[in-house]
Structure formats: C-alpha cells, structure tokens
Regions:
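Extended lipid/amphipathic-ligand handling interfaces
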Residues: 162-169, 198-207
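Structured extracytoplasmic
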Residues: 29-161, 173-176, 182-194, 220-244
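N-terminal signal peptide c-region/cleavage motif recognized by signal peptidases
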Residues: 24-25
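Bacterial N-terminal signal peptides that target proteins for export
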Residues: 2-16
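Exposed regions on extracellular, virion, or secretory-pathway luminal proteins
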Residues: 46, 171, 207-210
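Short, flexible helical or helix-coil boundary motifs
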Residues: 13, 17-20, 47
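Cysteine/selenocysteine-centered motifs that mediate thiol-based redox chemistry or coordinate metal-sulfur cofactors
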Residues: 203-230
Length: 244
C-alpha cells in the first residue's frame, strides 16, 4: 500500500512538473519575439552615422509624359570630412560633375541623410506585430513609423508608411536582412499626388560583425503640375571602410 501511495505521489509530481515545464516553455516562446526585438534594437543603437565611409552608386530611370531619362551618379560619404556633411559627388553619368552639378549637390547637402542600420532603432522603438514568412524568417510588421523615420520629397510621410522587417542570422547573430516600406497613396505639399511608393533595403553582416546596407531599390508613381510619371531607383553601397 505504501509503495502504491508513493508511486501515485511520484506520478502526480511528474505530471505537475510536466505541466509546469509546459507553461514555462509557452512563456519563453511567447517572450522570444520581444527578446529578439530588444536584441535588434540594442544592435541598431550601438551603430551610428559616423561608423563607415562608403561609396553609393545611384541608377535612376524616370518617365514623365512618355519621356524616359536614365542617369548614373556616384557619390562618396566620409564622416571624417566635415565639409558638405561628408558627402562628395564623384561622377555624373560616367563623367566628372560640372560646376553647376557640384553647386546643386552642395546646396542639397544639408538635406542629405546618412543611410545605415542605425536608423532602424527608431522603428524598433515603436509597436509592432510578428509573423513568420515562407522562408521561416521572423518578420516584424509596423503599421506606421515614428516621426522623421520616412522622408519622401522633403516631406515626412512616416505616419503613412508601413514597414516589414525580415530577420536573418549570421554566425548565430540575428539581424534585419530586408526592410520593405510601403507608403499609402497621398498628396505631398498639395502639388504632388503619390499613387504608389514601395522600397526594399537589403543588409548583410559586415566583416566587423556589424550589419551594413548593400542595396536600396525604390519604385514610385504619381502625378503633379499636369504631368504623370514614374521613377525606378537602385542604390548600391560599396567600398565600406570603418572610421571608428
């Protein structure tokens, strides 16, 4: 009898432990997205606009009222140079930039933002939902972005921009690999009607163990001042050099 009582007690204890472990596992699983989000936030906050010098090549194709123009600009960013915010226009359509092009580029320098992984810190400081894509990657979805996160044609469109951020892993370290932005149809400055804007930014893990931006592709269609148009832009980033 004593053996039976002891056996029953042990069985009950095991069952209770199994239930407890199940609840612990569920709690850990439920907490993983928040832990992952915090890790990526910390990762982005550890980086800054002055971490790297790099080259950016911009290939653009713009069509307005049936006329298409294609251009290729190459520019260089070096945070160790204070002039013009560190930006230098290297070439325009394969040739050295003209004086007018340099003057126009210099005038726009104060508006020119430094792209990079550090900018994602703003995203992860706001509310998001989580899902898993067809590649079994975790995807964070943001219905809108914090103020000053998305600038289009010198206008802040953050509140009308949704974002999907796909998380990959490199040598056991998670990082955001793809960032897809979609802007709702809207009017910009009462002049431009934006019908569609989508972009995707791709990152990879750099040799220093820090994520770096390698490509940004955007597509936009809209109309304004009696003209309809569209634009396709591909920006590639290369020649990264650590500055600090």
């Amino acid at each position: 009898m004593n053996k039976k009582i002891l056996s029953d007690a042990m069985t009950a204890a095991k069952a209770g432990l199994a239930v407890a472990l199940t609840w612990v596992s569920i709690a850990v699983a439920d907490n993983k997205p928040e832990e992952l989000k915090q890790r990526i936030l910390n990762q982005a906050q550890s980086l800054g606009p002055g971490d790297y010098a790099f080259t950016r090549t911009i290939r653009s194709e713009q069509t307005s009222n049936g006329k298409t123009e294609q251009h290729v600009n190459v520019e260089r960013f070096d945070p160790s140079k204070s002039e013009d915010g560190g930006w230098t226009l290297v070439s325009v359509d394969g040739a050295p930039p003209s004086e007018d092009a340099l003057a126009s580029y210099k005038k726009e320098s104060p508006k020119r933002r430094v792209p990079g992984y550090y900018r994602l810190a703003k995203y992860f400081g706001s509310a998001s939902s989580v899902s898993t894509d067809s590649h079994n990657q975790t995807v964070f979805h943001f219905n809108s972005l914090p103020k000053d996160s998305a600038i289009l044609m010198d206008s802040d469109v953050s509140s009308d921009t949704s974002a999907d951020l796909s998380v990959a892993e490199a040598n056991g370290t998670p990082f955001v690999e793809n960032v897809r932005l979609t802007v709702k149809p809207m009017r910009i400055k009462f002049v431009m009607k934006l019908d569609r804007y989508e972009s995707i930014a791709r990152y990879r893990m750099g040799p220093e163990g820090k994520p770096i931006l390698v490509e940004h592709i955007s597509d936009m269609t809209g109309s304004g001042m009696g003209h309809e148009g569209k634009a396709h832009t591909v920006m590639t980033y290369s020649d990264y050099r650590p500055v600090r």
